[in-house]
Amino acid sequence: MLKEFQEFISKGNVMDLAVGVIIGAAFGKIVTSLVDDVIMPIFGAIFGGLDFNNYYIGLSSAVNATSLAEAKKQGAVFAYGSFITAVLNFLILAFIIFLMVKAVNNLRRRLEREKPAAPAAPPPADVALLTEIRDLLAKR
């Protein structure tokens, strides 16, 4: 069983998947930083200090803090601002992946168009012989 597992792990597809997951996780951190450190401050500047991360609704009367971190210490909160930020992260990541897949597909199509057509395979020997006999009979 250990040998079968080793064969499974060493197959190319599993290794490619593992590399993809690792790169995807790192890329997700880049997108999160892009949203938190670049896009959200721009929204904040345009809309007057907008920071979705601190948008919440206290689910008990004991919650009266001004920041989400303090509010979570006071009790249960509905942190819809964090959800909005997560949705923005997802949309940006999905759009970037869409652009990457589109570029790869365009490259594949271009390479297929540029590839010369393969020469036709020679006919089987029996078909060639029958064609030759037909041609000889046609000459008589």
Swiss-Prot record:
The lineage of its organism: Bacteria, Pseudomonadati, Pseudomonadota, Alphaproteobacteria, Hyphomicrobiales. It is a multi-pass membrane protein. Belongs to the MscL family. InterPro entries: Mechanosensitive_channel_CS (IPR019823), MS_channel (IPR001185), MSC/AndL (IPR037673), MscL_channel (IPR036019). One of its GO terms (molecular function) is mechanosensitive monoatomic ion channel activity. NCBIfam families: mscL (TIGR00220), PRK00567.1-4 (NF001843), PRK13952.1 (NF010557). The keyword Nucleus does not apply. The chain crosses the membrane at residues 8-28, 30-50, 81-101. Keywords: Cell inner membrane, Cell membrane, Ion channel, Ion transport, Membrane, Transmembrane, Transmembrane helix, Transport. Channel that opens in response to stretch forces in the membrane lipid bilayer. May participate in the regulation of osmotic pressure changes within the cell. The gene is mscL3. One of its GO terms (cellular component) is plasma membrane. This is Large-conductance mechanosensitive channel 3. The keyword Cell inner membrane applies. Signal peptide: none annotated. PROSITE patterns: MSCL. Its main location: membrane. It comes from Mesorhizobium japonicum (strain LMG 29417 / CECT 9101 / MAFF 303099). Disulfide bonds: none annotated. It comes from the Bacteria. Homopentamer. It is found in: Cell inner membrane. SUPFAM superfamilies: Gated mechanosensitive channel.
